[in-house]
């Protein structure tokens, strides 16, 4: 239990209760999202009878709500983060139930949009909630543990799918309904999350901005754009290469994905601690070098076992880029800017995630499968150069610097008062 982050004041405090509720929500969300995603492709093929082009269309449609997330959060900016998360999980659950009602491509599109809107919102708000649980210097640890819990939920979901479909290969509707129920349970849990800042309770929720696009946060935006482009390239073509080029079957693909999930689950807390201990500049630079190794190896090493190893390496480090970017943002932004800035980051990430894979797919028709991975190496190289410029202390926004100076002044006055009383 060494990796478990003890909340400020212990488990009986509001921070401890919030930690447990967020962990329950994260586990439920990880299970529901990954279980439903695991069976969706087969469901579209076996039940809705999608054609090849329709898979491409539905993939693009599914990413659009992520691009529009900033609009949604701007409209609901008065809603607390915990209630917004609970609402998003309800929307996600409704989308999953809609899958059961669909009979073809056009009838499933509205439900895909709803489900995507729900899970993209949760993916943003859970970072903001996690960072509220503790002080700034421990943000990476909390987010790392939550990433591990997400992977644990995914692992349980993949195991459930494997054993259920081994005996009942057409049980799609029941799986989607079960995932919807689990998502709703996660929504119930997070609804009770307390209002916190730095792990300490607030009487009322902290106000936040409707929308934020500030020059002070430019490095966070750039990292989000590069991360979205690289990430979508790999996950669009990574498994496809294992299947089409190396001829790997369903059982082999399942094993690779399970190994990747187990490794990520085991090492996520450690990676979060490294972000806190060594800082974002060092950690994100190392992660981007690892991306270059994984993507370059995937393109250059024409060997199935090495390709699987590079896939596992990439999948293991993939969650840590957004965690490092989020902790960097927390160090330079005022509290009311963090949630809308995270939403802006997701929007920018999806702007590239929609465009880049399509362009790479067109290029792929004329050249070898290696090209998307070389492009991904280029994005990782640029990101590595950007991370070398990160210096949270010097890059704080003017409002954040003023807030820190005021807090330091108040602390100094309090210390002086204590000394005077002692004298």
What are these regions (language model features)?
Residues 161, 165, 181-201, 383-391:
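C-terminal membrane-cytosol helix-exit motif in multi-pass small-molecule transporters
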Residues 38-53, 236-252:
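Short amphipathic helix-loop junctions that connect adjacent transmembrane helices
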Residues 1-16, 193-228, 404-423:
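Juxtamembrane intracellular "pre-TM" segments in multi-pass secondary transporters
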Residues 84-98, 180, 282-297, 374-377:
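Structural signature of the two symmetry-related core transmembrane helices
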Residues 143-159, 348-356:
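Glycine-rich segments within core transmembrane alpha-helices of 12-TM secondary carriers
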Residues 68-81, 165, 267-279, 364-365:
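Helix-to-loop junctions at the C-terminal end of transmembrane segments
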Residues 163-181, 362-380:
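A membrane-interface helix-boundary motif in multi-pass transporters
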Residues 121-134, 320-333:
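Intracellular juxtamembrane helix-capping segments at the cytosolic ends
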């Amino acid at each position: 239990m060494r990796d478990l982050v003890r909340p400020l004041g212990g488990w009986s405090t509001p921070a401890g209760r919030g930690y447990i509720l967020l962990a329950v929500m994260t586990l439920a969300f990880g299970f529901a999202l990954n279980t439903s995603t695991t069976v969706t492709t087969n469901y579209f093929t076996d039940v809705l009878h999608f054609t090849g082009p329709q898979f491409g269309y539905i993939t693009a449609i599914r990413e659009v709500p992520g691009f529009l997330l900033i609009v949604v959060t701007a409209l609901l900016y008065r809603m607390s983060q915990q209630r917004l998360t609970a609402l998003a999980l309800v929307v996600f659950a409704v989308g999953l139930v809609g899958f059961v009602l669909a009979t073809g491509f056009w009838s499933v599109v509205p439900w895909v949009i709803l489900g995507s809107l729900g899970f993209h919102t949760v993916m943003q708000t859970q970072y903001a909630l996690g960072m509220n649980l503790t002080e700034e210097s421990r943000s990476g640890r909390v987010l790392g543990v939550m990433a591990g819990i997400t992977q644990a939920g995914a692992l349980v979901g993949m195991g459930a799918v494997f054993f259920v479909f081994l005996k009942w290969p057409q049980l799609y509707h029941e799986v989607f309904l079960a995932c919807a129920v689990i998502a709703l349970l996660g929504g119930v849990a997070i609804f009770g999350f307390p209002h916190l800042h730095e792990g300490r309770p607030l009487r009322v929720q902290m106000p936040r901005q409707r929308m934020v696009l500030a020059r002070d946060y430019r490095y966070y935006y750039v990292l989000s754009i590069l991360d979205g482009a690289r990430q979508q390239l790999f996950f669009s073509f990574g498994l496809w290469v294992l299947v089409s080029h190396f001829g790997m079957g369903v059982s082999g693909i399942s094993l690779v994905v399970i190994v990747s999930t187990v490794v990520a689950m085991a090492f996520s807390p450690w990676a979060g601690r490294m972000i806190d201990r060594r800082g974002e500049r060092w950690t994100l630079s190392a992660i981007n070098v690892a991306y270059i190794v994984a993507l370059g190896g995937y393109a250059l090493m024409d060997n199935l076992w090495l390709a699987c190893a590079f896939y596992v390496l990439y999948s293991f480090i993939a969650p840590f880029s957004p965690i490092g970017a989020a902790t960097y943002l927390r160090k330079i932004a005022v509290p009311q800017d963090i949630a809308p800035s995270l939403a802006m980051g997701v929007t920018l990430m999806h702007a590239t995630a929609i465009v880049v894979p399509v362009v790479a797919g067109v290029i792929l028709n004329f050249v070898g499968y290696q090209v998307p991975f070389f492009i991904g190496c280029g994005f990782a190289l640029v990101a590595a150069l950007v991370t070398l410029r990160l210096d949270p202390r010097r890059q704080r926004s003017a409002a954040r610097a003023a807030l820190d100076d005021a807090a330091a002044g108040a602390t100094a006055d309090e210390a002086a008062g204590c000394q005077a009383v002692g004298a």
